[in-house]
Amino acid sequence: ISLEICXIFHDN
């Protein structure tokens, strides 16, 4: 599950 990480990374 990298959805949470993706969101954070993309949010940056």
Curated annotation (Swiss-Prot):
The keyword Secreted is annotated on this UniProt entry: yes
Keywords from the named record: Antibiotic, Antimicrobial, Bacteriocin, Secreted
Protein's cellular compartments: Secreted
Thermal activity characteristics from the UniProt entry: Optimum temperature is 39 degrees Celsius.
pH dependence remark: Optimum pH is 6.8.
Any GO BP annotation: killing of cells of another organism
Claim: Methyltransferase is one of the keywords in the record: no
GO (cellular component) term, any one: extracellular region
Superkingdom of origin: Bacteria
Function: Oxygen labile bacteriocin-like. Has antibacterial activity only against strictly anaerobic rumen bacteria.
Protein name per its UniProtKB record: Lichenin
Protein's organism: Bacillus licheniformis
Highest classification ranks of the organism: Bacteria, Bacillati, Bacillota, Bacilli, Bacillales
